[in-house]
A protein has these predicted regions:
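Short beta-strand/loop segments at the ligand-binding rim of alpha/beta enzyme cores
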Residues: 8-13, 108-111, 181-193, 262-274
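Glycine/Thr-rich beta-alpha phosphate-binding loop at enzyme active sites
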Residues: 152-168, 201, 205-269, 305-309, ...
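N-terminal capping/small domains of soluble enzymes
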Residues: 1-126, 310
Length: 321
């Protein structure tokens, strides 16, 4: 996937899969002897907000490391191939992360991920402005080309769910793309989920400041009941934290269908597609749907021993294009 004349590769890790700087998580060390290996991917940082955010994931005093090996806000169902999380964008805020300096030392093209989370559009717009000003300040010190994934769809923040009018939703996304682009002329890739109507995605993709689309973020608990078999009770095990967002096996065919419909609707911008990739063959499903690249995330938890093969398969089948 080439954006602004920079090759960002054929496979990205989902934002947060390896933390804010690629430091990973304690369970990665446990799975490494069993074959967990991220070599050959493009790094995407965990989504940050402008200001420090407590979220639902307790962090150590360094501001980035989870306190618990098995956090209460993440539920893993290995046999079903499903992860449910209500992390809620816990983090130290953008200023802390830029000042840390580790992003600036990365040597390969990568993505930072950002989300504005204010209660109103006016507040979210101001957050985007201030984030863009920060980015502009530190951008000259980066060693490698960097893109920005703008998260518009985290279900644990529920910002997008508060904008029921698709037209207003598209207008807000375009406004934020425009203001960030005016400060930081870098590749911009909005991250949406399959609940985003294709017509909204088409309007966003038509914006000159949109360089690619990323789909799909996790799905809010209980959404798409005609496609996802939720529990009989309909009660989320993370109901006390707002319900959480689902990732894993059920999303693969839903994402593939969304990408196919996006292409039929005339969306020509590159699409980075992910959701439910748990084996190398799953990459072929999204490639067949006309995705330009893929992203892998929940496989690192659910099928860690397959991650290396998934990355290899993605690089093989997209390389020939």
């Amino acid at each position: 996937m080439i954006l602004h004349n920079t090759d960002f590769g054929h496979i990205l890790v989902g934002s947060g899969t390896q933390g804010f700087f690629g430091e990973g998580y304690p369970f990665h060390k446990i799975l490494k002897p069993f074959g967990l290996n991220f070599e050959g991917y493009t790094f995407v940082a965990k989504t940050t907000t402008l200001r420090p955010r407590k979220g639902n994931l307790p962090l150590k005093t360094d501001g980035i490391t989870p306190e618990e090996l098995f956090p209460d806000c993440i539920k893993v169902y290995f046999r079903k191939g499903v992860v449910l999380n209500a992390v809620g964008l816990s983090g130290p805020g953008a200023k802390f992360l830029f000042e840390d300096g580790r992003w600036q030392k990365i040597k390969k093209p990568f993505f930072i991920s950002f989300m504005a989370v204010g209660e109103s559009f006016e507040i979210r717009y101001l957050e985007a402005i201030n984030f863009a000003i920060l980015f502009k300040k530190y951008l000259p010190s980066f060693s490698a080309p960097v893109g920005l994934q703008i998260n518009f769809s985290c279900p644990n923040v529920k910002v997008g769910l508060k904008i029921p009018d698709p037209k207003i939703q598209a207008e807000e996304m375009r406004a934020i793309l425009g203001i960030i682009s005016s400060y930081a002329p870098i590749p911009l890739m909005p991250k949406i989920n399959v609940l985003t109507p294709v017509e909204v995605a088409k309007e966003i993709a038509s914006d000159p400041n949109c360089d690619a689309l990323c789909v799909s973020n996790t799905i809010p608990w209980g959404a798409l009941p005609h496609k996802i078999n939720w529990t009989k009770t309909g009660v989320s095990p993370l109901a006390h934290l707002g319900g959480g967002g689902l990732s894993g096996k059920p999303l693969l065919l839903i994402v593939a269908e969304w990408v196919l419909n996006a292409r039929k609707a005339g969306i020509e911008k590159p699409i980075n597609a992910g959701g439910g990739i748990l084996s190398p063959d799953d990459v072929d499903v999204l490639k067949g749907a006309a995705a330009d690249s893929v992203s892998v995330s929940s496989a690192a938890i659910l099928r860690g021993w397959r991650v290396k093969k998934i990355i290899r398969r993605a690089n093989e089948i997209f390389e020939g294009e």
